[in-house]
Amino acid sequence: MLMLLVRGTHYENLRSKVVLPTPLGGRSTETFVSEFPGPDTGIRWRRSDEALRVNVGGVRRQLSARALARFPGTRLGRLQAAASEEQARRLCDDYDEAAREFYFDRHPGFFLSLLHFYRTGHLHVLDELCVFAFGQEADYWGLGENALAACCRARYLERRLTQPHAWDEDSDTPSSVDPCPDEISDVQRELARYGAARCGRLRRRLWLTMENPGYSLPSKLFSCVSISVVLASIAAMCIHSLPEYQAREAAAAVAAVAAGRSPEGVRDDPVLRRLEYFCIAWFSFEVSSRLLLAPSTRNFFCHPLNLIDIVSVLPFYLTLLAGVALGDQGGKEFGHLGKVVQVFRLMRIFRVLKLARHSTGLRSLGATLKHSYREVGILLLYLAVGVSVFSGVAYTAEKEEDVGFNTIPACWWWGTVSMTTVGYGDVVPVTVAGKLAASGCILGGILVVALPITIIFNKFSHFYRRQKALEAAVRNSNHQEFEDLLSSIDGVSEASLETSRETSQEGQSADLESQAPSEPPHPQMY
């Protein structure tokens, strides 16, 4: 009897019975062979001209040795040229010795395309697989991009470059098209924070009332009041700019100066000032309530709409504190203190962005701008190059004429207006060369602006459809299911705990009964 020990594996009775290593997911097997393939004997464990039987995800095929020999660098080519069964097992997932069949737990659809590659030498792209899954399958089987057919190579490379940011395509990737799972997961994580918080259930309901207009009837009423206050604030700012109010404030300021008082506190109309105070009080209440009810303070300050709320009310309180600290003398010394109030009034216009909570179009526009920074950068680059070139040409052609083209920086305004096809007409060329330059500037602007705008418009359409689909899913969802989700976050009920205990006891009993010796099942081939 001959006994060998190779890499920790015991081989006994070399010419009669061989105990082979345990395959992946199976039992240790025994087989009878004529000779053992030693590393120095040069004897192969299977014939070199023997066909290779493979099973890929349930698809069984038989490949000829001649076809595999044409591509020795591929996985199946290396499997065909394997010098030992141990080496072959490293290249597959499992091996059926009775059928002499190699099993691969891979995509069966790609395997059919792989068979076509071994017949023709060209690999074609599968539309059923995304580019990344297709690339992973190709790398696993030992195929590179050079194996792609000429008809599919350009399309594959283009899709691979544009797939991570393909916001204008109707793909099925969760990150770009179907945000519902991600957004629902975010909501669940936020709601889970209330489980261990004090008065968590009450805070959670109030937070949902303020953040979700469709949550309940009080949330709809709160949303209507918030929109009304925002519109009233914007209307007050617009009314304040009317000439009659400006004249009234100017007269009040002159009277205050004549009386020896600071004119800063009497410039506002009393009605508009009261309306402004009411809006500020509501905005302050809204911001403070959201901050107190927010499940995460860090996430609250990272939300763009919350930052807009804070920036809108903060200048008012800073101006109020400065006025109280400086008094009348400070107001006279720092005459520009009123400009801070003007800045506050200007920043109030950003309150209109709060309407994005209730507008699908505004949310789609924000998402489009967020994911179109590359296109916007390209657009600005094109405009900068075009304005610089045509401004220099217009300056050269019109510098002798007194029409406003005195310097190249002065021509930048004309170039920007012309390239964007606005055409105010305040500065126009008068010479033939200047008019030709203006014609080129206008035509170039049409071409330059149109190219990125098309991509941005496609992205906006994509995000708009996605937001509409999400809103439809939220409207059609059962309110009782959402209540069940909220109840599940509070904790497991006593009935659920009792059921889990009974299930655990039954499982332990089943485990005790299953400890009896039995014949291990044979692995099944799919």
Swiss-Prot record:
GO molecular function, one term: voltage-gated potassium channel activity
Tissues expressed in: Detected in all tissues tested with the exception of skeletal muscle. Highly expressed in adult and fetal brain, fetal kidney and lung, and adult prostate and testis.
Segments of skewed composition (Polar residues): 505-517
Location in the cell: Cell membrane
CDD domains assigned: BTB_POZ_Kv9_KCNS
Membrane topology qualifier: Multi-pass membrane protein
An example Gene Ontology CC term for this record: intracellular membrane-bounded organelle
Superkingdom, natural source: Eukaryota
Keyword terms: Cell membrane, Ion channel, Ion transport, Membrane, Potassium, Potassium channel, Potassium transport, Transmembrane, Transmembrane helix, Transport, Voltage-gated channel
Membrane-spanning parts: 218-239, 271-293, 305-322, 338-358, 374-395, 436-464
Family statement: Belongs to the potassium channel family. S (TC 1.A.1.2) subfamily. Kv9.1/KCNS1 sub-subfamily.
Domain notes from UniProt: The transmembrane segment S4 functions as a voltage-sensor and is characterized by a series of positively charged amino acids at every third position. Channel opening and closing is effected by a conformation change that affects the position and orientation of the voltage-sensor paddle formed by S3 and S4 within the membrane. A transmembrane electric field that is positive inside would push the positively charged S4 segment outwards, thereby opening the pore, while a field that is negative inside would pull the S4 segment inwards and close the pore.
Protein name: Delayed-rectifier potassium channel regulatory subunit KCNS1
The species this protein was found in: Homo sapiens (Human)
The encoding gene: KCNS1
